[in-house]
Amino acid sequence: MTEEQIIRLEHLTKVFRNNHTVTAVDDVSFDVRKGEIFGLLGPNGAGKSTLIRILTTLIAPTSGTAYVDQYEVTRDPESVRAIIGVCPQNSTLDVELTAYDNLDFYGQLLNVEEKVLEERIWELLKMTDLTDRATSRVSTFSGGMRRKLEIVRAFLHRPLILFLDEPTIGLDPDSRFEVWQQITKLNTEKTTIILTTHYMDEAERLCNRIAFMDKGRLIALDTPENHKRALPAGDLIDIGFDRIDDRVLPAIRESGLVTSIEEKEKSFRISAKNGNSVLPAIIGIFEKFSVPMTSISIHSPSIEDVFIYLTGRKLDSGEGEQPQPAGGGKAS
């Protein structure tokens, strides 16, 4: 690996066999750079969590290789575990213990020296704004508070790499924002963060680079901005109206100013390379046929638009999800 790389995957594949064969990860190769927040984005069943399980040494790949720092995950799993922290999708906090005791218990499992551990616990509680709730049972915490505590617990031993599997799933918008702030704080300590999510806004807000996965395959990898620049459609113009003249739509199409038009009920969504430059001409067409507009908005493509362009469907459509083998299936 190069000096700037901290994770490298080479043709990684994972196949589960039970009553049927499922290729959860299919010939995936990429690298992760030191200190970045790297996003794995895709629908349920895309292979994100399976990939994380391989990188954290919970399961072995069927074929291919994966390196975490300088360690190959199947040959030196103990060295890998010593330098990573993992926050799984499903909570593993003991809700009957206090916030402090949850961190203390985990630190003892990691054999952190007692004096160092106490200082570190208070440091992390302060980071999460939970100092005044240190002696409160976790059962009394909101979903956002629990998630923040679980994330910093994985960070207790100052790992080089932090794996966060769907860190905000099931949280309300305010709690999601709190967790986003927490993740950003952790990244300022130069920790590399691997984030799996199916929330487009989360990946776009947090990640330096985003890898799109679908049906076990890597379909695109770049920065959020470069992903959006690669779209042929350009800007999106939404125009609302109460009534329409049948001549408006053909006139816009024949103008040569736009790349596509999507008809909706009482609105058009128009794609153009430069929305601001073509908007006056489009408005002129509406005015020519005496059609009043009720709303006009221009916005740049989103990460969701990128996913739709790459796969032909929305992320939450559920199409293309891979069934997971019952009971985990037989790995090969």
PLM regions: where:
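A short, flexible loop at the N-terminus of ABC-type nucleotide-binding domains that lies
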Residues: T2-I6, K14-D27, P77
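Walker A (P-loop) phosphate-binding loop of ABC-type ATPase nucleotide-binding domains
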Residues: P43-G47
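Conserved ABC ATPase "signature" region
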Residues: D104, Q108, K115-R133
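Conserved catalytic motifs of ABC-family nucleotide-binding domains
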Residues: R158
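Catalytic Walker B motif of ABC-type/P-loop ATPase nucleotide-binding domains
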Residues: L162-D165
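ABC transporter nucleotide-binding domain
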Residues: Q181-K273
